[in-house]
């Protein structure tokens, strides 16, 4: 399957592309080089599935050099729209994805599906069960940054339920990854956070309360 996909997309074998050695601080130089070569720029936040995909693409005999730019869903699509990336990894509904890349013919591939839900301390001492619990004045949350899927998911819920973000304790505490919000719960800096399931299990100190299954898309411009 890997060979047929490579030939169908017109990708040359890795041996035909020699990527110059750039110093660590020159990631922008590497990005610009790959944008104008046979390399690949992929934007998306960390996930085990995405890391596995990138590693396999890089080591496959007909693979290509891949540079991952760590961005949330919104910023990944923004980069795709302005041609600063070849692939955006986004976990939004199709209508939102297409609205953020207007006038561009897109191809979408569902890479995987995952559970989004609540991170809570082991044993769930506050007996949290859903996002409505965030409105309780005694509950402090660790929030994600604007443009990330957990933040968009939470903001859509608050809007639909006519709940003011100002009433949510910790709403303006913005962290930039699911790992960091999970760590905030594990270290008792907050009571709960919303995020992808894998991060809850890494510390061994948290329980995960699933709320919904979401798709993770690879979004590409159709040539």
What residues fall within each predicted segment?
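N-terminal hydrophobic or amphipathic helices and topogenic motifs
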Residues: 1-75, 81-85, 101-106, 126-131, ...
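Short loop->beta-strand "edge-of-pocket" segments that line small-molecule binding or catalytic clefts
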Residues: 35-46, 132-152
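Ligand-binding cleft/hinge of the Venus flytrap
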Residues: 52-62, 132, 144-146, 150-173
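Short helices/loops that flank or line small-molecule/ion binding pockets
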Residues: 74-88, 174-190
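Acidic, polar ligand-binding/catalytic clefts
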Residues: 87-117, 122-123
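A ligand-binding cleft/hinge motif common to bilobed small-molecule-binding domains
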Residues: 89-101, 182-212
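Periplasmic-binding protein-like
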Residues: 110-117, 127, 201, 205-223
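Flexible hinge/capping segments at coil-to-helix
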Residues: 111, 120-141
């Amino acid at each position: 399957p890997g060979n047929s996909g490579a030939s169908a997309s017109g990708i040359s074998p890795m041996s035909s592309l020699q990527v110059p050695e750039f110093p660590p601080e020159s990631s922008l130089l590497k990005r610009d080089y790959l944008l104008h070569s046979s390399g690949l720029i992929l934007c998306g936040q960390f996930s085990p599935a995405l890391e596995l995909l990138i590693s396999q693409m890089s080591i496959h005999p007909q693979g290509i050099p891949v540079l991952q730019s760590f961005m949330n869903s919104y910023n990944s699509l923004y980069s795709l729209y302005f041609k600063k990336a070849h692939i955006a990894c986004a976990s939004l509904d199709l209508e939102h994805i297409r609205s953020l890349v207007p006038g561009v013919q897109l191809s979408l591939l569902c890479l995987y599906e995952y559970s989004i839900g609540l991170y809570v301390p082991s044993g769930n001492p506050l007996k949290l069960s859903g996002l409505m619990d965030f409105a309780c004045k005694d509950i402090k949350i660790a929030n994600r940054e604007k443009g990330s899927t957990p933040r968009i998911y939470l903001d859509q819920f608050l809007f639909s339920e006519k709940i003011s973000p100002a009433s949510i304790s910790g709403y303006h505490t913005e962290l930039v990854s699911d790992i960091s919000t999970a760590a905030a719960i594990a270290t008792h800096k907050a009571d709960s956070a919303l995020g992808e399931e894998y991060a809850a299990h890494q510390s061994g100190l948290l329980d995960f309360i699933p709320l919904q299954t979401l798709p993770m898309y690879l979004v590409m411009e159709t040539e």
